[in-house]
Design a protein with these regions (language model features):
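Cytosolic regulatory regions built on CNB/CRP/Popeye-like sensor folds
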Residues: 1-159
Length: 159
């Protein structure tokens, strides 16, 4: 991710209040474009997805999502770091511009890992309910997402 994009994300986090929706902030689109699920979406669709994002802040330590809990949102890290831990003990750290929970937008399946704040953490959160509402309003977007999912599956089959 470019330094300009990381800087823009930190700026978003600093300028927003908890729960506030910062519509069409220019920093959102490049971040959403990096998410494999959204790669097939056009700019207009990405802007509609970006409008759904709300700021959510966490102090150091708290769990953001717990393994086994129903997936109800997608998160992009705007500032700070988070730790992902799978039930079998594998861990990895996420930082500005990283994201998690994107498949929860579609299926609401149980979370595969626990994610907790390593330090003060600011995220953009998109709820599954809001996202599904957008898909009902924009059926063409659902078709594009299906194309993106096919690409993801093909890439996995090559690996």
């Amino acid at each position: 991710m470019s330094p300009q994009c990381v800087s823009a994300m930190k700026g978003i986090a600093e300028s927003m209040q908890e729960g506030e929706n910062r519509q069409l902030h220019p920093g959102w689109i490049p971040v959403l474009e990096r998410v494999p699920l959204f790669k097939a979406l056009n700019k207009r669709h990405l802007k509609r997805v970006a409008r759904l994002a709300e700021l959510k802040r966490y102090k150091s330590g708290p769990i953001v999502v717990r393994a086994g809990a129903r997936g109800d949102a997608f998160f992009v890290i705007l500032d700070g770091s988070a730790r992902v831990e799978t039930p079998d003990g594998h861990t990895r750290d996420l930082h500005e511009g990283d994201y998690f929970g994107e498949l929860a937008l579609l299926d609401g399946a149980p979370r595969s890992a626990t994610v907790s704040a390593i330090n003060s953490l600011a995220t953009a959160r998109i709820s599954r309910t809001a996202f599904l509402g957008l898909l009902r309003d924009e059926p063409a977007m659902g078709v594009r997402l299906a194309h993106g999912l096919v690409d993801i599956v093909r890439d996995l089959q090559k690996a």
